[in-house]
């Protein structure tokens, strides 16, 4: 959530920065904001006036009572006037509280302001390539045979989309045998790198969170259509009271970042570095017809998430560091990739600046997103009331950052396609071999003998 003081001081500048973002409608109803602000100022000025008058009259009452019977009549009149002022003050306080709630609701739908270093653009075409990497420095590998996509490669290894549809529906899949083992190996490898080499604390979190947690990280109220709501005690989530509604997590960023909700940290405790491997659940409400084949866009997928809670002075340094932590996974796996600086029109709701890592997929002959690393500055912290006690002993909002380290399913896609062989087998990347019993090659003939 934006700092309302910034809007009050320089509304025109805020509007100009917000207009560089992509949206089918205005992010901020400026007329409503100005109307509420005008009423708030009027009520506050009137309140201060009434409080001053009440204080003056209260002193008069004491002086009149000191006169005894001679001042009784006048004292009673002044007391009646004070009682009237009290009633008006209570009415004003109630309305002022309502206005604050209306302003807060208005701000909950406003995205973060782009950092000055973010390129201005309308959509993904405005994103800027920062750097690219490949094992030999010459770009993606050239194959001397016709490449297959991950569906054709993975199906003989145990990738089963038809069974996923049978069990649940479209955009769900089942993995069995070798492919399931490779998927697990990727997740374990990612966790080991993030915890053992990059210093993150591994966490296990609930896969279901409450509405307050979703609001804290910015998924609610604006993106409820993208979430899977859970039933509680036979009650439809939509019918449940707001704070009792439950949702499947779209990313473990939500529970991990909420660790510091309503917490005041000591400055010495910063940075807080957390990671978790969880399933993620997304309705993909706006993705009808896109990536309908394969694992690229699923309702359920696994991801290893990185979250850092940091001192505000360190957040942009940390953004570069976390991007490097995600890159390290791709480099260790030997997967060609590029780093993109997202433009204003392509950034997520809560981000001030975002880097996307895109991995090369030979069958698509293009790069596809596999990680997104974002600095949210104080945007989430303000919603969460996540603070630290600074050197002056005052409570100050932390900055929050999050990133994928990495999306496990898409990493599986990249390994299958980049390490495929002409006979349909897949060479196991050197970094993953300890996690698959030392196997160097996975092929259909090595499929586990499973009675299905």
Swiss-Prot record:
GO biological process, one term: seryl-tRNA aminoacylation
GO MF annotation list: ATP binding; serine-tRNA ligase activity
InterPro entries: aa-tRNA-synt_IIb, aa-tRNA-synth_II, aa-tRNA-synth_II/BPL/LPL, Ser-tRNA-ligase_type_1, Ser-tRNA-synth_1_N, SerRS_1_N_sf, SerRS_core, tRNA-bd_arm
Recorded metabolic or biological pathway in which this protein acts: Aminoacyl-tRNA biosynthesis; selenocysteinyl-tRNA(Sec) biosynthesis; L-seryl-tRNA(Sec) from L-serine and tRNA(Sec): step 1/1
Cell compartments where the protein resides: Cytoplasm
UniProt similarity note: Belongs to the class-II aminoacyl-tRNA synthetase family. Type-1 seryl-tRNA synthetase subfamily.
PANTHER family tied to this protein: SERINE--TRNA LIGASE, SERYL-TRNA SYNTHETASE
Protein name (Swiss-Prot/TrEMBL): Serine--tRNA ligase
Organism: Albidiferax ferrireducens (strain ATCC BAA-621 / DSM 15236 / T118)
């Amino acid at each position: 959530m934006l700092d309302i003081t910034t809007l009050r001081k320089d509304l025109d500048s805020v509007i100009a920065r917000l207009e560089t973002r992509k949206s089918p409608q205005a992010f901020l109803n400026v007329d409503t904001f100005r109307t509420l602000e005008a009423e708030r100022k009027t009520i506050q000025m009137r309140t201060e006036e009434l409080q001053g008058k009440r204080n003056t009259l209260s002193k008069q009452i004491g002086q009149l009572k000191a006169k005894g019977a001679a001042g009784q009549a006048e004292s009673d009149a002044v007391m009646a006037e004070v009682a009237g002022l009290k009633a008006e003050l209570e009415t004003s306080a109630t309305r002022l509280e309502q206005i604050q709630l209306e302003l807060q609701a208005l701000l909950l739908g406003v995205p973060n302001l782009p950092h000055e270093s973010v390129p201005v653009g309308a959509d993904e075409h405005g994103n800027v390539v920062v750097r690219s990497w490949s094992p030999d420095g010459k770009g993606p590998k050239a194959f001397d045979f016709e490449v297959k996509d991950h569906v054709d490669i993975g199906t003989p290894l145990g990738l089963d989309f038809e069974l996923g549809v049978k069990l649940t529906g479209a955009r769900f899949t089942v993995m069995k045998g070798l492919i399931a083992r490779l998927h697990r190996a990727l997740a374990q490898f990612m966790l080991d790198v993030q915890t053992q080499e990059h210093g993150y604390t591994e966490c296990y979190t609930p896969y279901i969170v409450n509405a307050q947690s979703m609001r804290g990280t910015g998924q609610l109220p604006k993106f409820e259509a993208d979430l899977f709501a859970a039933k509680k005690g036979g009650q439809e989530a939509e019918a449940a009271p707001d704070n009792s509604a439950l949702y499947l997590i779209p990313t473990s960023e939500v529970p991990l970042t909420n660790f510091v909700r309503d917490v005041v940290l000591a400055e010495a405790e910063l940075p807080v570095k957390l990671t978790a491997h969880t399933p993620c659940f997304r309705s993909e409400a706006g993705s009808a017809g896109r990536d309908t084949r394969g694992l690229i866009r699923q309702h359920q997928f696994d991801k290893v998430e990185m979250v850092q809670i940091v001192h505000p002075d360190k957040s942009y340094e940390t953004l570069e560091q976390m991007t490097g932590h995600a890159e390290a996974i791709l480099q260790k796996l030997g997967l060609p990739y590029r780093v993109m600086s997202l433009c204003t029109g392509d950034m997520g709701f809560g981000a001030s600046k975002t880097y996307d890592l895109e991995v090369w997929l030979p069958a698509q002959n293009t790069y596809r997103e596999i990680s997104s690393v974002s600095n949210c500055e104080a945007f989430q912290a303000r919603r969460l009331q996540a603070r630290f006690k600074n050197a002056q002993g005052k409570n100050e909002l932390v900055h929050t950052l999050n990133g994928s380290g990495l999306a496990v399913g898409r990493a599986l896609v990249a390994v299958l396609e980049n390490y495929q062989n002409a006979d349909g087998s897949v060479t196991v990347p050197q970094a993953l071999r300890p996690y698959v019993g030392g196997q160097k090659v996975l092929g259909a003939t090595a499929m586990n003998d499973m009675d299905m």
